[in-house]
């Protein structure tokens, strides 16, 4: 394998000494851009295969292993799988991924989807009833699996349960009888690849997508949720309270609890009024 001189401008020595969280983000992104987005076009015969196809990802995973970093996490297993698939293609093998094309939902399944999308409401008052940790984890898992630009994997989550912790986050509504999930990001990962300069909008899209998934899963579990945003002062307080580095930034927060209100569902404009045509 011909090793690249640098990856995103980083030498092998720099990659060997890099913070594991940042290296992980670079691996995610390089596997995505150099293998994942190309492999299916290659398999379909729409694109030729380069002799070095997948070698950057293989090089990075070799560094990860040489550093003795764990390989059992799902995201790292995903990376290793793509590296193996790329190697197989590169050496003339044939792939059978065992995956299936999407199929339309059944009418019964669509009823659930419609209930999830069109019945969800923002809930701001909650019963004095604790939310089990098991449900909180399910909600956060949904946020983790939201679409994420370039698969970098910068999103982090903080759970506040105590009233004194709620005060760290500026909110324009009362916050009580709930848990607060704060969607955060490790900006070091974006900056390591200059995404904060090249695609700064991705930062906010990633946080918004995570918050939306959190709200949808909360609704599916019979809980209520309300998505709110906050500014730099809140970011500083949260960072200081948790004792985290300056690159750790909170973006939005979602309050979640057992509903104690049934508000009228807000309505939107007519569909034809919002579709722009020439």
Can you name each region flagged by the protein language model?
Residues 1-278:
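Acidic, surface-exposed loops and disordered segments
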